[in-house]
């Protein structure tokens, strides 16, 4: 009897899913609008989501990664670093691979208004001579790399490499609702070859399965989760459909087509798509997105937002993404973002050099509709309709 109980406990331990709650907050864009600063920001920062995936230059020890993509980010979680633990609010970003937070080495105003990691207060911190630089448009966040214990939910990830900022551009981060970024993409795109957090978790045997899953609730504040080491079927309906990863860097897949009312409007001969929790909107080629915006009646306001009449939502068609032979419809209630009496399009155009071909970014607008499993063991994504 005792052996049966022990075996049952062992089986249960192997199925533990470590759930990390995410909170939905006002985005940096909304904060800048409220402060009357968005127009000034956009004069010197031209958001182009493509720069996140195709940085202009890469160095051996100093890497680049655009920060404008986080202008619309709304989902954030809490982690801790060091001994005793120091808490930070981060974006769990499947479109990048590094972990970085502000530090006491940073004297920028943006750092002063956010939580800063103090290595002198941590008995487990180990410094390095390696550097990190992340571009944001007209300037950059610079920092150094170090090692320490990182706690994510109930998981204690020891000897984790991460970035400590030394300078941060004020306007970009001053009103940001997050302290740093926790990247969940493949190690091949990690700056300075730093081991990503999830890879370290798996290497140390801290998760029972080499995968994690994401549920983004449509609720205004609570209910969203990142689940490490497992899948919870109570967050989706039907069965998971699996899609092979086409490039083991980002969570990139091949998409068959994009259609409206049965007519293909983009990606006619298949194209590439990246599933990215760090991108709030659904992004595609500028011409295709422009055509869709016109079709649904969206028009730009003075702040550069594509506004639309809220009364039109019920009459607008689904945008259908066909992936690996399966159709994933996105209703207007998903791609039109409603706040109070204002409605804006959740679609955004981006410019990509022609040699890369047609590329789409399936951001939070898509992930809210479809529970997503990021399966590293089999290099595949699982998609199912979210509850």
From Swiss-Prot:
Q: Which GO terms describe its molecular function?
A: aspartic-type endopeptidase activity
Q: Which GO terms describe its cellular component?
A: extracellular region
Q: List the disulfide bonds.
A: 106-111, 267-271, 310-343
Instruction: Give the enzyme's EC designation.
Output: 3.4.23.1
Family matches, as CDD domains = pepsin_A
> Which range is the signal sequence, renumbered to this chain?
1-15
Write out the entry's keywords from A to Z.
Answer: Aspartyl protease, Digestion, Disulfide bond, Hydrolase, Phosphoprotein, Protease, Secreted, Signal, Zymogen
Reactions mediated catalytically: Preferential cleavage: hydrophobic, preferably aromatic, residues in P1 and P1' positions. Cleaves 1-Phe-|-Val-2, 4-Gln-|-His-5, 13-Glu-|-Ala-14, 14-Ala-|-Leu-15, 15-Leu-|-Tyr-16, 16-Tyr-|-Leu-17, 23-Gly-|-Phe-24, 24-Phe-|-Phe-25 and 25-Phe-|-Tyr-26 bonds in the B chain of insulin
- Propeptide residue interval(s): 16-59
Superkingdom of origin: Eukaryota
The record, for SUPFAM superfamilies, names: Acid proteases
Q: Which PROSITE patterns match?
A: ASP_PROTEASE, PEPTIDASE_A1
The Peptidase A1 domain covers which part of the protein?
Answer: 75-384
Give the GO biological process terms.
digestion; proteolysis
Instruction: State the compartments where it is located.
Output: Secreted
Tell me where in this chain the PTM Phosphoserine is found.
129
Q: Which Gene3D superfamilies does the protein's record reference?
A: 6.10.140.60, Acid Proteases
Q: Which residues form the active site?
A: 93, 276
Question: What InterPro entries does the annotation carry?
Answer: Aspartic_peptidase_A1, Aspartic_peptidase_AS, Aspartic_peptidase_N, Pepsin_A, PEPTIDASE_A1, Peptidase_aspartic_dom_sf
Q: What's this chain's function?
A: Shows particularly broad specificity; although bonds involving phenylalanine and leucine are preferred, many others are also cleaved to some extent.
Q: Which family, according to the similarity comment?
A: Belongs to the peptidase A1 family.
Protein name, as recorded: Pepsin II-2/3
Give the species this sequence originates from. Oryctolagus cuniculus (Rabbit)
Q: What is the lineage of its organism?
A: Eukaryota, Metazoa, Chordata, Craniata, Vertebrata
């Amino acid at each position: 009897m005792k052996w049966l109980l022990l075996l049952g406990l062992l089986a249960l331990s192997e199925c533990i899913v470590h759930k990390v709650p995410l909170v939905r907050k006002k985005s940096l864009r909304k904060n800048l609008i409220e402060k009357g600063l968005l127009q000034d920001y956009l004069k010197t920062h031209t958001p182009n989501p493509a720069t996140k995936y195709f940085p202009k230059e890469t160095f051996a020890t100093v890497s680049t990664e655009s920060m404008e993509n986080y202008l619309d980010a709304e989902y954030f979680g809490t982690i801790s670093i060091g001994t005793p633990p120091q808490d930070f609010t981060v974006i769990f970003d499947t479109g990048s691979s590094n972990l970085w937070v502000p530090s006491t080495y940073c004297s920028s105003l943006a750092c002063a208004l956010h939580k800063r990691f103090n290595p002198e207060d941590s008995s487990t911190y180990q410094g390095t001579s390696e550097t990190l630089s992340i571009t944001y448009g007209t300037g950059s966040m610079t920092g150094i790399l170090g090692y320490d214990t990182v706690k994510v939910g109930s998981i204690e990830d020891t000897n984790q490499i991460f970035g400590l900022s030394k300078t941060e551009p004020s306007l970009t981060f001053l009103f940001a609702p997050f302290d740093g970024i926790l990247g969940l993409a493949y190690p091949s795109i990690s700056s300075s070859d730093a081991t990503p957090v999830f890879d370290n978790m798996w290497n140390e045997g801290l998760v029972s399965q080499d995968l994690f899953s994401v549920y983004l609730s449509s609720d205004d504040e609570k209910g969203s989760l990142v689940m490490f080491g497992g899948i919870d079927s109570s967050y989706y309906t039907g069965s998971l459909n699996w899609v092979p990863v086409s490039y083991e860097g980002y969570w990139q897949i091949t998409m068959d087509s994009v259609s409206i009312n049965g007519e293909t409007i983009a990606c006619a001969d298949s194209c590439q798509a990246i599933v990215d929790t760090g991108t709030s909107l659904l992004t595609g080629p500028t011409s295709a997105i422009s055509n869709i915006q016109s079709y649904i009646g969206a028009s730009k306001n003075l702040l550069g937002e594509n506004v639309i009449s809220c009364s039109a939502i019920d009459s607008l068609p689904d945008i259908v993404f066909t992936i690996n032979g399966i159709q994933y419809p996105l209703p207007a209630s998903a791609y039109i973002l409603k706040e109070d009496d204002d409605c804006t399009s959740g679609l955004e155009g981006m410019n990509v050099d022609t040699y890369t071909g047609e590329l789409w970014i399936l951001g939070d607008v898509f992930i809210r509709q479809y529970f997503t499993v990021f399966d590293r063991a089999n290099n595949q994504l699982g998609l199912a309709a979210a509850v």
